[in-house]
A protein has these predicted regions:
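N-terminal chloroplast transit peptides
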Residues: 1-51
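Peripheral, non-AAA+ core regions of ATP-driven protein-machinery
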Residues: 2-6, 13-21, 54-68, 86-87, ...
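C-terminal engagement/docking regions of AAA+ P-loop ATPases
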Residues: 2-3, 348-362, 373-423
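Conserved ASCE/P-loop NTPase catalytic core
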Residues: 3, 44, 58-65, 69, ...
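Conserved phosphate/pyrophosphate-binding and hydrolysis machinery centered on Walker-type P-loop NTPases
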Residues: 92-96, 121, 181, 318-322, ...
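Non-catalytic, well-ordered alpha-helical scaffold segments
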Residues: 100, 125, 235, 276, ...
């Protein structure tokens, strides 16, 4: 299965025009007719000339003389890698369940993230951070702290949308998807962002300093030891991940911005569990155990020693595998929309959920999405029962009601019920 497999500190002033560096890459503009409001669709209170939402919200992109060349971008990426070398994802030995859950979330972010629970020292953080090399590139408005999508109004900050509607030309650049680490001791203001009340009162402007949720928009937010995080912060993260927006309210002043990200949490069950209500908000759940096979343990130790001795040489030895997996992910993301799942299989998935007494419909929805993402990863356009069998334990095990008298693993209960229904 292993083979198938910066936050800006400058305050944003809503009442002042935005200025973006024109030395980045491309320029986008949205032609508009002054005084004409007919045929507009409204996103967040701003009318957008369109007939059917995003499909009509395409912008004209033109190159400028100071465009950053691909070679310069590659050089910048290489310099970042040299500062902090990351262990290659394809070099990880074992932990196939966890790796598959991560890949499926990258292919379809709407799965809803993944919660990883396992013993200490099993490579949870290493594997999550190794995902950085496989993340695809996206187009963003240069200089925008929210990583606004130049073609999707639902992923734009308010100022960018206003500027586009005015006909302003904004620079566009291509960058890799962000992975943002949330420190365990982070405050709510650091996570959500802060409003400068003094400036609001004295100057009459909304001065907002974006937090980690703004930086994670259209990217990945990773929380290590999420089970030790304050419950109210976990609630904030899960609400933002589900709604795709973050709202900050202080002293009667309210500011909202897009916050669409993949939430990845990890933790050690010995240090405490998450509340069932919070667990249910994670799309998938992966259990990571200590490798017991002596030969595999030796291989892991040897590979780690090679990496520590010469990270660049070690990464180069896995370059071909990394590129192959990256292409596979890109192809799966492109073909995901054409993957189909038969109605009969949908009915059986829902029957499994119903007979396991799974509360709500999140389990049904996530299982359908994960099965389609797996089919896309394998290069198929149709979901098979085998795809469902692979993902359904990770989609449902954390949604089952806990029975203190039940000794069997919840994942095994899901598998038993699957074969009972699908046979």
């Amino acid at each position: 299965m292993a083979r198938i497999l910066g936050t800006c500190s400058t305050a944003i002033l809503a009442s002042r025009p935005l200025s973006f560096p024109t030395s980045k890459s491309s320029v986008l503009s949205l032609p508009s007719t002054p005084g004409q409001s007919h045929g507009r669709k409204f996103y967040g209170g701003i009318g957008i000339p369109a007939k059917k939402g995003r499909s009509q919200f395409h912008v004209a992109v033109t190159n400028v003389a100071t465009e950053i060349s691909p070679a310069e971008q590659a050089q910048k990426l290489a310099s970042k890698e040299s500062q902090r070398p990351v262990y290659p994802f394809s070099a990880v030995v074992g932990q196939d369940e966890m790796k598959l859950c991560l890949l499926l979330n990258v292919i379809d972010p709407k799965i809803g993230g993944v919660m990883i629970m396992g013993d200490r020292g099993t490579g949870k953080s290493t594997i999550v951070r190794s995902l950085v090399d496989l993340l695809p590139q996206i187009q963003v408005v240069a200089g925008d702290p929210f990583n606004s999508d130049p073609e999707d109004p639902e992923s734009m900050g308010m100022e960018v949308r206003e500027s586009i509607l005015k006909g302003d030309k904004l620079p566009v650049m291509t960058t890799k998807i962000n992975m943002v680490d949330l420190p365990l001791g982070a405050t709510e203001d650091r996570v959500c962002g802060t409003i400068d009340i003094e400036k609001a009162l004295t100057e009459g402007v909304k001065a907002f300093e974006p937090g980690l949720l703004a930086k994670a928009n259209r990217g990945i937010l990773y929380v290590d030891e999420v089970n030790l995080l304050d419950d109210h912060l976990v609630d904030v993260l899960l609400d933002s991940a589900a709604s795709g927006w973050n709202t900050v309210e202080r002293e009667g002043i309210s500011i909202s911005h897009p916050a669409r990200f993949i939430l990845i949490g990890s933790g050690n069950p010995e240090e405490g569990e998450l509340r069932p209500q919070l667990l249910d908000r994670f799309g998938m759940h992966a259990q990571v155990g200590t490798v017991r096979d002596a030969e595999l343990r030796v291989k892991i130790v040897e590979e780690r020693a090679r990496f520590d001795k010469n990270p660049k040489e070690f990464r180069d030895s896995y370059k071909a595998e990394q590129e192959k997996l990256q292409q596979q992910i890109g192809s799966a993301r492109s073909s995901l929309g054409s993957v189909e799942i038969d109605h009969d299989l949908r009915v059986k998935i829902s029957k499994v959920c119903a007979e396991l007494n799974v509360d709500g419909l999140r389990g049904d929805i996530v299982t359908n999405r994960a099965a389609k993402a797996l089919a896309a990863l394998k290069g198929r356009d149709k979901v098979t029962p085998e795809d469902i069998a692979t993902v359904i334990p990770n989609c449902l095990r954390h949604r089952l009601r806990k029975d203190p008298l039940e000794s069997i693993d919840s994942g095994l209960l899901v598998i038993e019920k699957f074969y009972e229904v699908f046979s």
